[in-house]
Curated annotation (Swiss-Prot):
Protein name: BLOC-1-related complex subunit 8
Taxonomic source organism: Homo sapiens
Modified sites of kind Phosphoserine: 109
Major localisation: membrane
Gene designation per UniProt: BORCS8
CC per GO annotation: BORC complex; cytoplasmic side of lysosomal membrane
GO biological process assignments: heart development; lysosome localization; organelle transport along microtubule; regulation of endosome size; regulation of lysosome size
Summary of subunit composition and partner proteins: Component of the BLOC-one-related complex (BORC) which is composed of BLOC1S1, BLOC1S2, BORCS5, BORCS6, BORCS7, BORCS8, KXD1 and SNAPIN.
């Protein structure tokens, strides 16, 4: 009869021991220690990723600014085509006046071709 009683007492002791080990293993301070270890191992990599992302963001912002500036410049060129046409007309008019003045200075009318030079 003592053996079943001894087994019961042994089972109670092992159950209490198991419960104590479980409580100790899951105690908040142990959990916080494990969390601290995880953070200590992971933090440098996360900090590097953050720095990389910030650098990429700066590069992207610079590229976006460059593209927007280029688009603005192209739009301004398109908008200024009226002025280019006006300048072109004025240049043609100036060339025509110059030719007329050169022809008048040589005694020829602009419609007559100049005499061939004997060179």
């Amino acid at each position: 009869m003592e053996e079943p009683e001894m087994q019961l007492k042994g089972k109670k002791v092992t159950d209490k021991f198991t419960e104590s080990v479980y409580v100790l293993a899951n105690e908040p301070s142990v959990a916080l220690y494990r969390l601290q270890e995880h953070v200590r191992r992971s933090l440098p990599e996360l900090a590097q990723h953050k720095a990389d992302m910030q650098r990429w963001e700066e590069q992207s912002q610079g590229a976006i600014y460059t593209v927007e500036y280029a688009c603005s410049a192209v739009k301004n060129l398109v908008d200024s085509s009226v002025y280019f046409r006006s300048v072109e007309g004025l240049l043609k008019q100036a060339i025509s006046i110059r030719d007329h003045m050169n022809a008048s200075a040589q005694g020829h009318s602009p419609e007559e071709p100049p005499p061939p030079s004997s060179a």
